[in-house]
Structure formats: C-alpha cells, structure tokens
Regions:
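Condensing-enzyme catalytic core mediating Claisen C-C bond formation in acyl metabolism
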Residues: 2-10, 14, 312-411
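Short acidic, glycine/serine/threonine-rich loops at helix termini
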Residues: 211-215, 268-270, 294-300, 359, ...
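Conserved small-residue
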Residues: 175, 200, 265, 272, ...
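Hydrophobic alpha-helical hairpins/lids featuring a short glycine-rich hinge
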Residues: 168-228
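Conserved catalytic cysteine-centered active-site region
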Residues: 45, 122-169, 207-271, 304, ...
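Active-site-proximal alpha-helical scaffold in enzymes
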Residues: 170-184, 237, 241, 255-290, ...
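Beta-strand segments within the central parallel beta-sheet cores of soluble alpha/beta enzyme folds
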Residues: 188-199, 255-260, 284-289, 360-369, ...
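ACP-dependent fatty acid/polyketide chain-elongation machinery
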Residues: 1-160, 351-365
C-alpha cells in the first residue's frame, strides 16, 4: 500500500516560524554554532519586525526575552475586565432615583420602575426597591504565564484579516508557511493530482474563543454590545481547514475537521494517512490551530485546577517572584500546565507521487494510534489507553524496521503536557 511521506511542514508557535526548523533552533539556540545562531536571530528579528541589527547583543537579548513562554502580553493580566454583581439600596426611606439617556432604557422595563420623561434625550427612573446591577471591574489574573508567538509578530497585518479571530489569523500564516516549505507553488501542488485526490483535514480543539468569534457571541449581549454576523460561523472548530481551502489552496477536494482535545492534531493526521494508504488521497494538508490565550479561557482552565498559578510557582521556587519563563515543567516538579497558542501544519504525499514530483522527503508517517481508556473515575487522569497506544506504535516500528533498529536505532519523543 502507499506510504504517507512528509514533504513539507510549517507554522508558527512561541519559538517562531516552524518551517526549516527555525522554531526548533530557537529552543536550542545556545547550543548552535555561530552561523546557525546568526541565521536564527535574523529570522526572528524579521518576524518580530525589529529595526535593530540582529547581531547586536541588546537586540538578541530582547528576542530571547520575547519568545517562548513568558508573561502574558496579549492582554493585561494585571487588569482583566470583570463584572461584579451588586445590590444598590437607598440611604433613607426614599426610593432610588436616577436618570439615564432614553436610548439606553432596557427593552423590558422592570415592574418596580417608574419612568418620567425629562426631555427628548433623558428619562428619570424611580426604583421602589433595591436595584441589582453589574459594576465594571478589573482583576489581577492568578495565572500570568503563557506560550505566545514572538512579540511584534502580527498575523492580521499580513493579509486582509477582516476581524478574523486570532486562531484563524495564525492558520493563514501557518498553512501558507507549510505549503511554501514544499518548494511547490500552490497551483503546482494542486495540479499534481486530480481535484478529488487532495484533501485538507484540520480542526481546533477549543474553537475560536476570542471576541471576534464565540467570545463575542456569548459575551457581547452581557456587556451592552451586539453579536455580529461573523461570530457564530468563525467560532466553529473546523474553521481552520475551511480557511485553508478558501484563502490559500482554493481546493474543491475533501475536507474534514476532527476534534479531540490535545490529540486533535493526531486525529487529523490519522485520517490523512488512512486515506493515503487506501489510495483515496494522494496529497493531504493536515494541521491544527489554537489561540486559547484569552482571559476567560485562562480562568476556565484555572478553576478546574489545570493551570500553574503564580502563587503555586512561587511556592515551588521558594521565591516571592513568579518566574514566568519556567512555568512549564512537564517532567519535573510542577503545579499544572501552561496554555499556549500555535498553528502547525504538515503536507503529506504518497511515496510514488513524492518520487515522481521530486518533492523533498522529510520523513514518513506509517501509523497513528489513539485509544480510549476504558472505565475510569476521572476523564483527565491517565488510563490504560496510553499503554495500548505505545505498544502498538512500537510493534509497528518493529514490523517496519526490525527489532534491532527499534531497540538501538530509534527513540521515543515523550509528550509532556506543559
């Protein structure tokens, strides 16, 4: 059967641009030789729109400080918008009296209100009882660490974004980076096969939850604003794949969005390799985009006890200062994981097409295994499915390469939820 091969990869994450290993080089930049360090810093300086010389030590330190995990910059964690509920009562026996612009009157007037028109623009309200209100407030977030794309990188400025949610902005950049990494132009890649032999499989586990999508849809009515015509559609979790088809590839081939928490990317890769191995597809673009660094998502994960809070990190370090840079410690003493944004994409081909087209072969994806955990008391807790997945993956590698290569010439890349 056809073997699925990787012929391109790319995207954007807190370490920078993924294609050609730029992001990986940022992770190990202190261990690179001088030439590769220079190239990595130059790439990041361009991405971050820095005016200074990337050879300058001050610029290099700025690049280091404003990539990877760090204190949240996307919003101000020291002033998160909030509403505090309150009950207003009169200070004496009199009723509560106030006036507001007439156009701000609610559509449904409370039964304990008496209205008196002052003029064409204002109305006086007399409230016979106590008045329940929401007071605009600001709170300090208990979580201030996140993985964010490099400071200064603005995906919305690179195309006509038209109020697109951040996750979809990252999608356009990430998928474009992956396709260009193949060396083929979009038209060339599309014309290698028949229209129904190319597919895009992608999703977003969280969907788009900022104010330009589901965040605005759900919050605007409670904050005195209206939802827009884009909020509902652009929040759908399969929208990253739709954006690739519509804005980048112009494909009329098959598309799908498979969602599964932190395994969303793997679910879509599995669909891709199954289709290539069966001969149904010859080119598949597969990826995932997540942009969960928004206040209500951070708070949602925090209250379920999933995120590393600042006070807990201070306690781990026995310090009065939260070290945001070291918030993610998946294989060490930790207090929870750290949210991050990213958009990562693969371009897969069957082996025959890759050889015929002269594509640059980066590796193969022979199998993907995903198993449920059976009965368990806690959904997020570890389960037997992990053991089944690893066992089948090792058996597949043994069948392909032999036991000696499996034991002595292979390695396991551990996934630590950080």
């Amino acid at each position: 059967s056809p073997l699925p091969l990787m012929v391109g990869f790319g995207g954007i994450n807190p370490a920078g641009r993924a294609s050609f290993h730029h992001a990986y080089r940022r992770l190990v930049i202190d261990k690179l030789d001088q030439e590769k360090q220079d190239g990595t810093f130059a790439s990041l300086a361009k991405l971050m729109r820095l005016d200074g010389n990337s050879q300058d030590s001050t610029v290099r330190q700025y690049i280091k400080d404003h990539t990877l995990i760090r204190k949240i910059e996307i919003f101000d964690p020291d002033a998160v918008n909030w509403h505090s509920s309150a009950t207003l009562k009169n200070t004496d026996a009199k009723s509560i009296t106030f006036k507001i612009p007439t156009k701000q009157l609610p559509e449904t007037i409370p039964s304990n209100w008496s209205l008196t028109k002052i003029n064409d623009k204002e109305t006086q309200i007399i409230c016979e009882e106590s008045l329940s209100v929401l007071l605009p407030d600001e709170r300090v977030s208990k979580v201030t660490s996140a993985g964010q794309v490099p400071s200064g990188f603005d995906p919305a400025a690179l195309y006509a974004s038209r109020s697109h949610p951040r996750g979809l902005q990252l999608t356009v950049y990430g998928a474009s980076d992956a396709i260009q990494s193949t060396g083929f132009k979009v038209e060339e890649l599309r014309n290698l096969v028949r229209p129904d032999e190319i597919a895009v499989y992608s999703g977003s586990a969280m969907g788009q939850l900022d104010n330009d999508a589901y965040g605005g849809l759900l919050q605007n009515p409670l904050t005195g604003r209206r939802p827009t015509s884009k909020h509902c559609a652009l929040g759908l979790p399969e929208m990253p794949g739709d954006f690739v088809n519509a804005y980048i590839l112009g494909s009329v081939g098959e598309t799908a969005g498979i969602i599964g928490a932190c395994a969303t990317f793997l679910y879509n890769v599995k669909r891709a390799i199954d289709d290539i191995r069966s001969g149904n597809k010859r080119v598949v673009i597969v990826g995932n985009s997540e942009a969960p660094v928004v206040p209500h998502v951070i708070e949602g994960y925090r209250v379920m006890g999933a995120l590393a809070e600042d006070e807990e990190l201070k306690a781990l370090d026995d310090s009065d200062i939260c070290d945001n840079r070291r918030a993610c410690r998946p294989f060490s003493s930790n207090a929870g994981f750290t949210c991050a944004e990213a958009s990562i994409w693969l371009v897969l081909m069957d082996d025959q097409l890759a050889l015929e087209s002269g594509a640059r072969i980066l590796g193969s994806v022979p199998d993907v295994f995903v198993h449920a955990d059976g009965y368990k008391k806690s959904i997020p807790g570890p389960g037997i499915g992990n053991y089944l997945t690893v066992a089948k993956a090792m058996a597949s590698a043994k069948n392909l390469l032999g036991e000696q290569v499996l034991r002595q010439g292979s390695f396991m890349q551990a996934h630590g939820t950080g």
